[in-house]
């Protein structure tokens, strides 16, 4: 269907109609030519719009795609992908410069070699089942974890893990806060050989002989055998032993203490819930593991065709990782606008693995596609004292304004303003653009 008010089409038709020397057939042919030209022009404009959308995503410093990850570990049995520093493309995200994001992927029945990190780690099990073992002060603690579990790994703590599932891959999302070089972290492998290279190999043989009280030939054998990488296949017997064996007091979760053991985010009561979605939150005020990092972890499951927001955070910058599903997000940003005092719409398509960031104060909305639920894991930095301000639905900020303030701000009678902002009776999760149109009988698609 062509636009009703295409000025070029209207001008072309008038010209054909006014040409008196044309007979009726010629006028009809001329009209058809005008419409074909209008269609071509509309298609060109559409292609230009899509190119502009693609360019917008390329220049968007708030969105990170596959190409923004690098492989730190890659073996036949799994990999570790690390997101580039948040400030690599823009200083606009300098508030989270000392945080890094990584994703571990491991095949069924695999072993991830022992390592320690010069960073504080918080892990979220996005998929699968694992056993995570930490060595602390001459004792070992093991935790069986599953989908939805959050666990803290203190900086410098030796840690290793297994994917104890025989059929399902393991996916773990990690957020790291470096403690040595701001914005940079390293994994240090003690156990290993050539791949992963053991840090013991950096010392001279004389020093190692004296420290370990063994001969060089023995050292060369121990530190020269492993060459398969830091993620390797393990037998069923090894997996069974590492899932259950424990020295000292048993600490296999859920029998361990909450202060060091996992928190299952999805077992908590949702902080927001209706037919359009659910939000689960682990707040630092409620969980000791997250307090000193000033970090909140949340998980949103947005029903297909629905949306979360718009809203904004007062202090927290939200780092979001798409775990499952598809959709898109929109955010109002004053920093990328070409003129002062105005806002640019930041938007991007969302799919599994995409990372997007909403800084404090930036209004944002996240919309699920019509085909699948959209599941988003979020790490909120600077969470202490943060407030979430809704911009639509129950409790939205405009409804809290005084009547006179509404009239002065909008230059309209307050009843007209209230007719807009009091119409939505849901909170946080709402029907998305497509559902709204379907309910209104207007049809159309906002996103595919």
From Swiss-Prot:
Keywords: Allergen, Copper, Glycoprotein, Metal-binding, Repeat, Seed storage protein, Storage protein. It comes from the Eukaryota. GO terms for molecular function: copper ion binding; nutrient reservoir activity. Residues 1-66 are annotated as: Disordered. GO terms for cellular component: extraorganismal space. Glycans are attached at residues 47, 301. Residues 1-44 have a biased composition (Basic and acidic residues). N-glycosylated at Asn-301 mostly with xylosylated paucimannosidic-type N-glycan MMX (an N-linked glycan with beta-1,2-xylose residue in the structure) and also with MMXF (a complex N-linked glycan with alpha-1,3-fucose and beta-1,2-xylose residues in the structure). A mixture of proteolytically processed and unprocessed subunits exist. InterPro entries: Cupin_1 (IPR006045), RmlC-like_jellyroll (IPR014710), RmlC_Cupin_sf (IPR011051), Seed_Storage-Functional (IPR050253). Homotrimer. Homohexamer. This is Vicilin Cor a 11.0101. It comes from Corylus avellana (European hazel). The lineage of its organism: Eukaryota, Viridiplantae, Streptophyta, Embryophyta, Tracheophyta.
């Amino acid at each position: 269907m062509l636009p009703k008010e295409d000025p070029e089409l209207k001008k072309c038709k008038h010209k054909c109609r006014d040409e008196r020397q044309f007979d009726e057939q010629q006028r009809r042919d001329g009209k058809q030519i005008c419409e074909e030209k209008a269609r071509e022009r509309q298609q060109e404009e559409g292609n230009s719009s899509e190119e502009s959308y693609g360019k917008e995503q390329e220049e968007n410093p708030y969105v990170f795609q596959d190409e923004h990850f690098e492989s730190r570990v890659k073996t036949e049995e799994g990999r570790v992908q690390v997101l580039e520093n948040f400030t690599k493309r823009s200083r606009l995200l300098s508030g989270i410069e000392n945080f890094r994001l990584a994703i571990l992927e491991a095949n069924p029945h695999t072993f991830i070699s022992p390592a320690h990190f010069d960073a504080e780690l918080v892990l979220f099990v996005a998929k699968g089942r694992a056993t995570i073992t930490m060595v602390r002060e001459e004792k070992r603690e093991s935790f069986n974890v599953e989908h939805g579990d959050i666990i803290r790994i203190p900086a410098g703590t030796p840690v290793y893990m297994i994917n104890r599932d025989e059929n399902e891959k393991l996916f773990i999302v990690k957020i790291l806060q470096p403690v040595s070089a701001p914005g940079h972290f390293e994994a240090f492998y003690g156990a290993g050989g050539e791949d992963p290279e053991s840090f013991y190999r950096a010392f001279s043989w004389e020093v190692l002989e004296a420290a370990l009280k063994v001969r060089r030939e023995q050292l060369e054998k121990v530190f020269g055998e492993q060459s398969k990488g830091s993620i390797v296949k393990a037998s069923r017997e090894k997996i069974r032993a590492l899932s259950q064996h424990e020295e000292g007091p048993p600490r296999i979760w859920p029998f361990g203490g909450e202060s060091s053991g996992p928190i299952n985010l999805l077992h908590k009561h949702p902080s927001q819930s209706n037919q359009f979605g659910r939000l689960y939150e682990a707040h630092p005020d409620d969980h000791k593991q997250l307090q000193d990092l000033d970090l909140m972890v949340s998980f949103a499951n947005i029903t297909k065709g629905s949306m979360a927001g718009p809203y904004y955070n007062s202090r927290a910058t939200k780092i979001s990782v798409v775990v499952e599903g598809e959709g898109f997000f929109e955010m109002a940003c004053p920093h990328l606008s070409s003129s002062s005092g105005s806002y640019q719409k930041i938007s991007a398509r969302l799919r599994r693995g995409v990372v997007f960031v909403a800084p404090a104060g930036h209004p944002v909305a996240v919309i699920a596609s019509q085909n699948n639920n959209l599941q988003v894991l979020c790490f909120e930095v600077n969470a202490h004292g943060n407030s979430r301000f809704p911009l639509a639905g129950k409790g939205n900020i405009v409804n809290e304004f005084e009547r006179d303030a509404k009239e002065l701000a909008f230059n309209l009678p307050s009843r007209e303003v209230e007719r807009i902002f009091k119409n939505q009776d849901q909170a946080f999760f709402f029907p998305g653009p497509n559902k709204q149109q379907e309910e209104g009988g207007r049809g159309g698609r906002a996103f595919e």
